[in-house]
Amino acid sequence: LPVTDIWGVLMRKDSPLAARPTIRPQDLPGLPLLASNQYLVKNEFSGWFGEGYEKLNIITTYNLLYNASIMVEEGMGYALCLDKIVRTSGDSPLCFRPLEPKLEVGLHIAWKKYQFFSKAAEKFLECLQREIAAWRKADSPAQE
């Protein structure tokens, strides 16, 4: 998809790190971290952390960020996660801080080649394909 998502840290609003606008690699060693299984499988962070990667204190992994957010809310640690998955606005006790330098990932959608879709799913996919085609056309240089 023609968009990216941003990695960062989910934490309690009363955490000392919450006062910072961004989180740097040197901020994380020694902190109890919750990492997504996606993070571990793809090893998204080893390059970002550099030599400090081995010093990370990953106390558990999660499949669903919602479950990790409950642990973060209870003060068990800090979740390495993508932005805008868990509500952090309003009266939420949680906040998200992006990593610095920025770590972005592309978003993808996949389906089986000969999949039978419901009418709603079929219309959604058609609309998505039109939007992506329009984005690509707008993003490509004008042909002379």
Q: How should these model regions be labeled?
A:
Residues 1-6, 20-21, 66-114:
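Beta-alpha-beta core module
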Residues 42, 64-65:
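Conserved glycosyltransferase catalytic-site signature
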